[in-house]
Structures are given as structure tokens and as C-alpha cells.
Amino acid sequence: MLLTLAQWLQNDYSFLRVVNYLTFRAVMANVTALVIGLGFGPWVIRRLTELKIGQAVRTIGPQTHLVKAGTPTMGGVLVLISIAISTLLWCDWGNRFIWVVLLVTLGYGAIGWVDDYRKVVYRDPRGMSSREKFFWQTLIGLVAAVYLAFSVSEASNVRIWSLFLSWIEGGMFADVPYKMNLIVPFFKEVSYPLGVTGFIVLTYLVIVGSSNAVNLTDGLDGLVIMPVVLVGGGLGVFAYVMGNAVYSKYLLFPHIPGAGELLIFCSAMAGAGLAFLWFNAHPARVFMGDVGALALGGALGTVAVIVRQEIVLFVMGGIFVVETLSVMLQVSWFKFTKRRYGEGRRLFRMAPLHHHFELGGWKETQVTVRFWIITMLLVLIGLSSLKLR
């Protein structure tokens, strides 16, 4: 919005030309989201407290968590509002990728909001059923995947619909450009052709998987938001490179016109995340809830797909991956041993993995900060793949 206004007025006010620079708008998006989050955070926390929207704590977990009962939750609403306002203020409204990421983020946020609302307001600990939640995640993920399959490969909005129709008429087979291949980091000449169907399947898995992985990681004060900020920032760098014809050619990456604008979204997400961390740091005054965790995970997955860095997301978001694997292994092993021995056994003291370390004697802040440090290192490894290829 401000970009359009600045372009309209820049002939009379030359200093407004600075708004044309993507990096300037990215910095301003970050600052705007940070200010909104810090400014409205106390008010949101008071309102959540007045409405008695408090967190329920399981008695089977670490006993130190019992004091968290009643802490306001659904604070992720503040994060999403900060991201949306900041992004819309500073982005190019004509960029299709911005709208895809925003719609996926807000769509997954809506799923999380309904889940949190049922848990807190209706006092239903189950919230949305797993089947219902998965249905809506799948619907949003597939719609986004189908659209991205053609918008990533085609620079013109006019051509996207005709490409989709030709794909349907061709029995869901079509020739696709190199930029739709699965890029293998650290190897400049290694990529795997996916085809349209393969691209759609991979995109769906990345978006839905990332959303649920971030949600599973959200279990300690400040644990998930800093990795989201770090990974989002790393993906923002990739977005800037992929959207720049010169840099992408120099670094031997496919050029994706319009992808650079996602730097605005990633910067806004980082600013909103840091503002939320101000209130979510131990001892937390507010929790994110599913409304924030599902949305931010979906956002990371969508950005990673657009900039063709699905494997890099897997690397940089290693904490999310390990947390998810710990739950899957715990459940699978428990079911297997129950069938085999008549009694379920556990691989970990408790899943997700952060609870395993807590029950092993680590303090909550130790788990959180150490997971942050690991994420910092993983993000640096991911960023190094820009040049080390």
C-alpha cells in the first residue's frame, strides 16, 4: 500500500523513492511488526486474562509446568495481526506470492483459532478432532500446492490459468521448467525433476508437515518462536536471492520473478516474533496457542516451497524435525511393544523431545536456549549452501 502511494507522490517528493528499495521496505516491515506487537501486547494479554482464556496444563507432564495453568493463551492472534498489517503496508500488492503466503498463514491460523477456542471457551480438551483438523489443513495445503505448481513456473499471472487447463486436458501431465525441480543443497548440478504432480505432493507435505512440526515444538516458554524467527529470516535471504536475476544467476539458482517480495513477509514475521518473545520469555505472560503455531509453521513451509528450498527448510528447521520424529517414534514404539509384549514401552521419558530433557534434569530455560543455539547453527549451515555448492 505504501509502495503504491510513494510511487504516486515520488515525482513531487523525491525522498519517497527510497520506498522502491526492497531492502528498505523489509527493514520497515520488521520495525512496524515489532512496534505493533510491543505496543498492543499488554492490552491483548489483559483482554485474554479478562476473558479467562487460560492455558490448561496436563498433570502427567513435568511438575514445574503446573504453575503455568491459567496463563493466557491464543496470543498467536497478536503475531498474525502484526504480520498481516506490516506486510500489507510495505509489500507490493500486485505480487501473487505475498497473497498466497498470507492466505495460507491466516487459513492455518483460523484452524488453530477454532481448535484453541473449543479447548478454552468450551472447556473441551480435545479441541478439533484430529480428522477435522487434518481435513482443513489438507484442503488449504492442496489448494496452495496446485496454485504454486503453476505460479512458480510462470512469471505472468495471465498464463497461470491456461497452464492449469492444459495440465488437466493433458491428463495431468505437462512439461515443467527446471525451476520446479527439487534442489539439493551444496550440489550445484544436482536436482530432481518432480513434474506437476510430484511438485503438488511435495508442496502439500512441506506445508502441512511444517505446520504440525512447529505446533509440536511449541511446549516451553519461548521455545518455538525464536527458531521461527531464525528460520524465517534465513528463508528471507533465499527469497531475496531467488527474486534477483543477477544474484540468482551468479549463485547458480533458478530465478523466480516476484519471490524477492517474500523478504517483506519474512521480515515482518521476524519482527512480530521478537515482539511476542518479549512477553513469551520465561516466565511467560502469554502463550501462542495453535492459532499461532499452526499458522507460522504453514508460513515457513509455503515460503520454502516458493523459493525452492524444501531441503534447506528441513536442515534449518532441524529442531522442528527432531521434535516431530520423537513423537512419531514414541507412539510407534509404544504401539509395537504393546502388541508384541502386551505392555507399551517408551523410547523417551516423554514426547515431544523437549519434555524428555526436562524430565532428565534440564531446566526449562536450559532446554529453550540450547534449542535456540542449535537452530542458529543449523540456519548458518543452511545459508552456507548459497555459496558452498
UniProtKB/Swiss-Prot annotation:
One of its GO terms (cellular component) is plasma membrane. The chain crosses the membrane at residues 25-45, 74-94, 97-117, 134-154, 167-187, 190-210, 222-242, 259-279, 286-306, 311-331, 366-386. It is a multi-pass membrane protein. It comes from the Bacteria. Keywords: Cell cycle, Cell division, Cell inner membrane, Cell membrane, Cell shape, Cell wall biogenesis/degradation, Magnesium, Membrane, Metal-binding, Peptidoglycan synthesis, Transferase, Transmembrane, Transmembrane helix. Its cofactor is Mg(2+). Pathway: Cell wall biogenesis; peptidoglycan biosynthesis. It is found in: Cell inner membrane. One of its GO terms (molecular function) is phospho-N-acetylmuramoyl-pentapeptide-transferase activity. Pfam families: Glycos_transf_4, MraY_sig1. Its main location: membrane. Its EC number is 2.7.8.13. The keyword Metal-binding applies. Catalyzes the initial step of the lipid cycle reactions in the biosynthesis of the cell wall peptidoglycan: transfers peptidoglycan precursor phospho-MurNAc-pentapeptide from UDP-MurNAc-pentapeptide onto the lipid carrier undecaprenyl phosphate, yielding undecaprenyl-pyrophosphoryl-MurNAc-pentapeptide, known as lipid I. PANTHER family: PHOSPHO-N-ACETYLMURAMOYL-PENTAPEPTIDE-TRANSFERASE, PHOSPHO-N-ACETYLMURAMOYL-PENTAPEPTIDE-TRANSFERASE HOMOLOG. Belongs to the glycosyltransferase 4 family. MraY subfamily. This is Phospho-N-acetylmuramoyl-pentapeptide-transferase. It comes from Cupriavidus metallidurans (strain ATCC 43123 / DSM 2839 / NBRC 102507 / CH34) (Ralstonia metallidurans). The gene is mraY.
